[in-house]
From Swiss-Prot:
PANTHER family: 2-AMINOETHYLPHOSPHONATE--PYRUVATE TRANSAMINASE (PTHR42778:SF1). One of its GO terms (molecular function) is 2-aminoethylphosphonate-pyruvate transaminase activity. It catalyses: (2-aminoethyl)phosphonate + pyruvate = phosphonoacetaldehyde + L-alanine. The modification N6-(pyridoxal phosphate)lysine is found at K192. It comes from Pseudomonas putida (strain W619). One of its GO terms (biological process) is organic phosphonate catabolic process. This is 2-aminoethylphosphonate--pyruvate transaminase. Coiled coil: none annotated. InterPro entries: Aminotrans_V_dom (IPR000192), NH2EtPonate_pyrv_transaminase (IPR012703), PyrdxlP-dep_Trfase (IPR015424), PyrdxlP-dep_Trfase_major (IPR015421), PyrdxlP-dep_Trfase_small (IPR015422), SP_NH2Trfase/AEP_transaminase (IPR024169). Keywords: Aminotransferase, Pyridoxal phosphate, Pyruvate, Transferase. Involved in phosphonate degradation.
Length: 368
């Protein structure tokens, strides 16, 4: 490992030397070897959700939000209506995407520390039969709250509606089985729990829905139907692919399998989260969420109630000790966030806790 700080963020995150070294090779975007690399990545991604029988994996250049916008724009018909479930900033982003795309939508918003319930969704769908799709965030990255995906998905299926899942911060670490959870689209990205680098999103699109989506898209570049059709025909991307990102993700997926796949990745992140929560509690810092709805991905902490605490100063001091934290993203209270993901283990998390404790002493922050 270099002397670069450890990124305790929800992505981009700290990657392994092997993953970074995979980007030292240049690839021809139309070359057969690169096409095989793309196909291998998509095959491995589908295997994580046991989705090869029911879904296509459609990769897309750009951040995860590019892929979310592409999924909504491609799969929601122009006369469709989306019910957007919100309990944080990324749910708000789903609604903004629908608005910009001109898709009819309604929203249901709960407090930032309250998961949406299946009963909420049941009531909302019963009251509005015009809804065609429901969009939700699985793990809301602004807090780390985990929404009850399985229960909500069953309600949506019972009402005959279609589910779009933003699984950006959960895919690869939390179990999602396409054979058990009915969804039309699930979206994730290269630079999160798979421990690749940012630059590629991907959409698991239900096969029949994708086949029926021709002409829906608002954009040429974000047309997932066209993207998939071209890849299926030629093995190639329509437009210049992020070759180095894909090579890094391929290497990261090899390491994912070597570690033990999803169960092992989940366990390491859960151990990281426990170390973080226990350590921060020991120095008096309170987590924002109760344990039963806290995902082991990113943890939000209340900022110290002391005039000597200023986040910018705190951040720079912790960075000088080797750790990059994340600012809070809540609307009502001052917080900061610490990620549990990336190439880091419990020992690294304890070192981060020790750094935070040292910094608070240096700042003479007493009222925690």
């Amino acid at each position: 490992m270099s002397n670069a700080p450890i990124l305790l963020t929800p992505g981009p995150l700290t990657t392994s030397l092997r993953t970074r070294q995979a980007m030292l090779v240049d690839w021809g975007s139309w070359d057969r070897d690169f096409n095989q690399l793309t196909a291998s990545v998509c095959e491995q991604l589908l295997a994580i959700i046991d989705g090869s029988a029911s879904h296509h994996c459609v990769p897309l250049q750009g951040s995860g939000t590019f892929a979310v916008e592409a999924a909504i724009g491609t799969l929601v018909p122009r006369d469709g209506k989306v019910l957007v479930l919100i309990n944080g900033a990324y749910g708000q982003r789903l609604a903004k995407i629908c608005k910009v795309l001109g898709r009819n939508f309604s929203t249901f918003e709960t407090a930032e520390d309250q998961p949406t319930t299946a009963a909420d969704v049941d009531r909302l769908l019963a009251a509005d039969p015009s809804v065609t799709h429901v969009a939700l965030i699985h793990c809301e990255t602004s807090t780390g709250i985990l929404n009850p995906l399985h229960e909500i998905a069953q309600v949506i299926k019972r009402h005959g509606k279609r589910l779009i899942i933003d699984a950006m911060s959960s895919f690869g670490a939390l179990p999602i089985d396409a054979r058990e959870i009915p969804f039309e689209a699930l979206i994730a990205a290269s630079g999160k729990c798979l421990e690749g680098v940012p630059g590629m999103g991907f959409v698991f699109a239900e096969k029949t829905a994708l086949a029926a989506a021709e002409g829906n898209a608002h954009s040429l570049a974000m047309d997932l139907h066209d993207q998939h059709a071209y890849m299926a025909k030629t093995g190639q991307w329509r437009f210049t692919p992020p070759t180095h990102v894909i090579a890094a993700l391929h290497e990261a997926l090899l390491q994912y399998a070597e570690e033990g796949g999803l169960p092992a990745r989940h366990q390491r992140y859960a151990d990281n989260c426990k170390t973080l929560l226990d350590g921060m509690a020991a120095i008096g810092l309170r987590s924002f969420l109760p344990a039963d709805i806290q995902a082991p991905i990113i943890v939000t902490f209340h900022a110290p109630n002391d005039a000597r605490y200023q986040f910018k100063d705190f951040y720079e001091r912790v960075k000088a000790k080797g750790f990059i934290l994340y600012p809070g993203k809540l609307t009502q209270v001052e917080t900061f966030r610490v990620g549990c993901i990336g190439v880091v283990g419990p020992d690294g998390m304890q070192a981060a806790v020790n750094a935070v404790a040292d910094v608070l002493r240096e700042m003479e922050v007493l009222d925690i």
